[in-house]
Amino acid sequence: MATDTPPAITTTETDFARSVDREIIRQVGGMNLRGLRALREALSTSRPGLPVAAESLREHWLALDDGAVAAVADAPYLLFDLSLEPAFEASRHRLPEEAPPPRAETGLCGAATGRGFARLMCHFAWQTSKARPAAAALLLGVNASTCNTLRALDLLELDAIAETAGECVSLRWGADLRFWSRRLDAARTADRAALWESTLAGVQRLAALARA
């Protein structure tokens, strides 16, 4: 009798490169760009609750021109964490007629732009987990368990989680000042070699996470 076998998860940089195509990389870059715009909006209004790598580098983030922001966004993986476990847990325990908790007005997704980005991230992660399961762990920067949970959601469940996912989204490696200062400087000076080194370092970190 046939059994459902979970798809193999990409765990090396080489496997990752072979399992994705230009279209998904373009989509990831677009997601990153939208998230960076939400981050810069939050920084420009001095919104509380932002990660260290945003707050400490505020002037660097806000000094970037559009071309430099696009260069920062150009990575084959999401530059934002989507930590959905709290949202999964809250959704399991919420009664059907129970309203979701009030939205926080802090952090990356405290305003409408950020909340829209959080919803989009949830739907993108769900679609990617379903359509490209082998590469999802590295593209999204999440573990295999989260990918499997996402893939099992139906649309109604996904929508309920997406509406309250703002607090689950944050800048990836948000405490790593070294990573972000180097990436921002490389983008500002149009140093393509340094940008590539930064991007590759991120792929290696996510590959290690996927193997864990």
Positions of PLM-derived features:
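Membrane-interacting alpha-helical segments
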Residues: P102-L120, C168-F179
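C-terminal structured domains
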Residues: A210-A212
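Generic surface-pattern signal
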Residues: L33, E41-S44, P48, L62, ...
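Long, compositionally biased
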Residues: V69-V72, P76-L79, T164-R205
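Residue-level signal for secondary-structure boundary elements
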Residues: R47-P51, F80, K130-A137, L158-A162, ...
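Amphipathic alpha-helical packing elements
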Residues: G114-G166, S170
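Structure-specific DNA junction-binding interface
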Residues: M1-A99, R103
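Alpha-helical ligand/cofactor-binding cores
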Residues: L33, R40, S83, A87, ...
